Amino acid sequence: MPLGPWERVEAALTLLAIDPAGLKGLWLRARASALRDRITGALGALPLPVRRIHPTIGDDALFGGLDLAATLSAGTPVVQKGILDEPAVLVLAMAERTLPGLAARLGTALDAPRHCLIALDEGAERDELLPLGLVDRLALFLDLDGLPWGETREIALDPERLAAARARLAAVATPPEAAATLARVAAQLGIASLRAPTLALAAARAQAAWEGHAAVTDEDIRRAADLVFAHRAMPASEEAPPEPEPEPPEDQPDDSPPPPEQQQGEEMFPEEMLVEAVRAALPADLLEQLAAGRAARMARGATGTGSAKAGNRRGRPLPSRMGRLGTGARIDLVGTLRAAAPWQPLRRRQQKTDAVLLVRPSDIRIKRFRETSDRVLIFAVDASGSSAMARLSEAKGAVELLLGQAYARRDHVSLLAFRGRDAELILPPTRSLVQTKRRLAGLPGGGGTPLAHGLRLALAVGLQARARGMTPTVALLTDGRGNIALDGSANRAQAEEDALKLAASLRGSGLPAVVIDTANRPQPSLAALARALDAPYIALPRADAHKLSNVLGAAMGD
């Protein structure tokens, strides 16, 4: 029988309290509320101390090290311990805002069986999600969205029964077929990660210990698969029925051996039942949210000369500020001495010392810089049909005009063309005008319109550019009449559906875009595509290179 919403909460917390290090933790998707407090209040049942952390926590707090301010004040080395030095339950607030660096550090800490992470995901939007590296490592997931308060109750975990379960956990026997069954079920559910069946096996052992079983049973496996696989499973796809096996001739005796004894009876772990049970518990829309990711906040508002961010390593200097010395921070020595100088006579009298310099933590000044990333404008040009050469000429001219100002605006440009049955990267991101003219010379055109292929390649180029620290923008130039689907077929309806799906992926990735309709009359299909991209739509028939360059400059905020 499937678990109810609150029964699922209690079951997850019970297993986590038995083996927190083996299950790694819990992804709790819920806004701050009394309901969430009811769940976090039950974390006291876990056999580890609770430590609260936040997305901006520094390496000094996580790993410890030399406390420079205290060392300067005391005159002797002062070492502070880090949160990760001792096993703990790490409660991460606002987990959806976790940056990749912190996610990597927490993931490394979870790989050692010492800590347990409770990720409090407060994301209000579909694209605000926990980093996938942490999603993969945490065994359990709970979503409290839409759960009424009246259907909940106080969580009372029996401490004596939990202690007994922990004591017998190591002695629980695991049948060899249990791990194989979980691995096959994960594969049938479309789960690629190898961590998932390992975590499910740990959950099954914890469930067996809770129930007092000497070995893992099929019911333990079913409960573990429900709790660990449901939010990871891919939707069921329609598969073609298998071809019937040829029947042997009637006059030929059947010499095949009888099936093994285990197959003649009932399977110990019925895989089909496990798969159906997991699919029944599949959270609604979670897979689409995971596909969209949490990157839409990153590049949505990039304008001007690229994304600007405050840093402490390089860029245009900003006034220093008070702060603590942590990993990556650079002390402003002059600013620190200037802040400490007026207090020296008073400090010498208070400490009755003739030391030359007495520095307090409040004197520390940290250098700040404003870093500006380079922009890259990715032209995705429709090079198909009779008007291909005109569009390519416009794009070539616009690229050369933009490159002429690239050094002043820190711009790069890239050009890809889609025609025939595929898309091709003509020009990787560059600022070289000579290289650009050489690559653009003699670019062919004509054929079908694989619009979805162009969007897919633009997405790949944009993500690669962003990984290199650049701020990409996609400029799509087309007349909107896509007629080649992703599978290569000349199916206009499927091609339009594929293009809209790729547009949603591009929007979810956070890459800003602009759609330029080069048809003689505005195309409603392109306006719909622009809405799917959340991008400006500009109808620009008979555009020349100067007009196109001006439009793109305005769209990018110049």
Swiss-Prot record:
Would you say which domain of life the source belongs to? Answer: Bacteria
Which SMART domains does this one have? VWA (SM00327)
> Low complexity composition bias: which ranges?
298-308
- Residue stretches making up the VWFA domain: 376-555
Annotated stretches, region: Disordered? 234-268, 298-325
Recorded GO MF terms: ATP binding; magnesium chelatase activity
Catalyses which reaction(s):
protoporphyrin IX + Mg(2+) + ATP + H2O = Mg-protoporphyrin IX + ADP + phosphate + 3 H(+)
The answer to whether keyword ATP-binding applies is yes
According to its UniProt record, in which pathway does this protein act? Answer: Porphyrin-containing compound metabolism; bacteriochlorophyll biosynthesis
Gene3D superfamilies, alphabetized? Magnesium chelatase subunit I, C-Terminal domain, von Willebrand factor, type A domain
What disulfide bonds does the UniProt entry report for this chain?
none
User: Any idea of its EC number?
Assistant: 6.6.1.1
Locations of Acidic residues compositional bias? 240-254
Q: Which UniProt keywords apply?
A: ATP-binding, Bacteriochlorophyll biosynthesis, Chlorophyll biosynthesis, Ligase, Nucleotide-binding, Photosynthesis
A GO biological process of this protein is:
bacteriochlorophyll biosynthetic process
**In its keyword annotation, does this UniProt entry include Ion transport?**
no
**Protein role:** Involved in bacteriochlorophyll biosynthesis; introduces a magnesium ion into protoporphyrin IX to yield Mg-protoporphyrin IX.
Task: Give the PANTHER family listed for this entry.
Answer: MAGNESIUM-CHELATASE SUBUNIT CHLD, CHLOROPLASTIC
Report the sequence similarity comment from the record: Belongs to the Mg-chelatase subunits D/I family.
Record's protein name: Magnesium-chelatase 60 kDa subunit
This protein's species is: Cereibacter sphaeroides (strain ATCC 17023 / DSM 158 / JCM 6121 / CCUG 31486 / LMG 2827 / NBRC 12203 / NCIMB 8253 / ATH 2.4.1.) (Rhodobacter sphaeroides)
Which taxonomic lineage does the organism of this UniProt entry have? Answer: Bacteria, Pseudomonadati, Pseudomonadota, Alphaproteobacteria, Rhodobacterales
